[in-house]
């Protein structure tokens, strides 16, 4: 069980009178510290890889710019459920083509999802397809998903997720990952862009795909993405005009500094990234493998912590407003976002409540002070993690908890 805390925002770009970082007015150069695990969608489930895939592969459904709602991408309709709720039928557009001239039909759609499950790569998104029993293709433009869950409300989100890119069955392997060189050489793309060149985690080149018939056509002809080792190098690239746009990830301090630079424009919006505080059900206070297991008391401890976290303080003081307080499992900007935690925990308006936490513990018969062990990774989730967890420790201790931080 996790406590949603923060959701990210912000990208930075240089403001220029003309031209671009590449020297070509038609080329946009993007800088990022993200890493790409795999260009093949079956081999990755991370932001860096998805940033490549979402630009070169089509989906049945996607989000248009500036909206959280899903709309048809290469689908021709919104899909329909059977009367018994076990089959979801999608019609796809006719005459679809990959950049290499291969036809894109329902067979490619079925192939794309089936291979994710068959390959079941340890870094891949196969877990997202757990509710899909099987897929049928009665004709070239019809796909039928047989669902294990009746009227599964998450299915369309899954079809638009990292498990959802549609690939060319004439190029991709059915039972193993296909390397980036082969994918590029065979032009196996049907998304807004074509990946024209790629050197792993160094540079990627994209050109507009004129045959794309989906929701979000490219608005420029060429994009170049440069990959940086860390945020300090990315910040320097912005300041020196080496990139037009910096997206994922600059530190809060970097963004704060760049926002004061008249040559740089900082754009803020929903980022889709979340930060959670997660409990281990086994070893948390009163956990299943603790000295005194008790499900009701364990739940009370989790609820008490949820009542004590000051999300606004973390967002402002630690992350300098590059994150926003989050009161949902689903971040702002994605379908299904609702601030349900805002009224469920704390004072009902987004702030913490020590009194409410105390009552929850008392009602469950939990003795105080509660001893908590917080553990975090100092670099994997950003350089501000140490400050974030120090602030969390202080918040919990102020309310009387005893916190060990590692």
Question: Which sequence ranges carry the predicted segments?
Answer:
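Structural transition elements
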Residues: 324-363, 379-385
């Amino acid at each position: 069980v996790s406590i949603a805390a923060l959701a990210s925002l912000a990208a930075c770009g240089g403001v220029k009178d003309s031209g671009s970082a590449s020297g070509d007015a038609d080329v946009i150069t993007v800088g990022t510290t993200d890493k790409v695990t795999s260009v093949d969608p079956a081999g990755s489930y991370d932001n860096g890889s998805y940033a490549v895939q979402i630009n070169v592969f089509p989906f049945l459904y996607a989000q248009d710019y500036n909206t959280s709602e899903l709309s048809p991408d290469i689908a021709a309709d919104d899909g329909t459920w059977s009367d018994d709720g076990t089959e979801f039928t999608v019609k796809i557009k006719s005459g679809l083509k990959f950049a290499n001239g291969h036809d894109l039909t329902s067979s490619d759609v079925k192939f794309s999802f089936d291979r994710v499950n068959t390959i079941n790569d340890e870094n891949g998104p196969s877990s997202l397809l757990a509710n899909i029993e099987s897929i049928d293709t009665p004709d070239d433009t019809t796909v039928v998903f047989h669902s294990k869950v009746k009227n599964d409300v998450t299915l369309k989100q899954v079809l638009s997720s990292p498990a959802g890119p549609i690939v060319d069955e004439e190029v991709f392997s059915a039972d193993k990952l296909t390397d980036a060189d082969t994918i590029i050489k065979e032009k196996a793309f049907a998304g807004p862009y074509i990946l024209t060149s790629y050197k792993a985690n160094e540079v990627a080149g994209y050109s507009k795909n004129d045959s794309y018939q989906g929701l979000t056509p490219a608005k420029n002809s060429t994009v170049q993405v440069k990959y940086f080792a860390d945020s300090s190098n990315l910040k320097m690239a912005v300041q020196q005009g080496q990139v037009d746009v910096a997206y994922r990830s600059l530190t809060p301090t970097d963004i704060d500094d760049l926002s004061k630079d008249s040559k740089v424009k900082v754009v803020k919006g929903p980022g889709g990234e979340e930060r959670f505080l997660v409990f281990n059900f086994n070893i948390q206070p009163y956990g299943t493998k603790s000295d005194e297991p008790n499900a009701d008391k364990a739940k009370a401890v989790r609820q008490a912590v949820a009542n004590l976290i000051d999300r606004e303080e973390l967002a402002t003081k630690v992350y300098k407003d590059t994150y926003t307080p989050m009161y949902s499992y689903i971040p702002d900007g994605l379908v299904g976002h609702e601030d349900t935690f805002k009224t469920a925990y704390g004072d009902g308006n987004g702030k913490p409540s020590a009194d409410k936490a105390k009552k929850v513990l008392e009602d469950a018969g939990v003795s105080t002070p509660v001893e908590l062990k917080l553990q975090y990774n100092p670099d994997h989730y950003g350089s501000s993690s140490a400050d974030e967890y120090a602030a969390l420790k202080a918040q919990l201790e102020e309310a009387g908890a005893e916190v060990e931080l590692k």
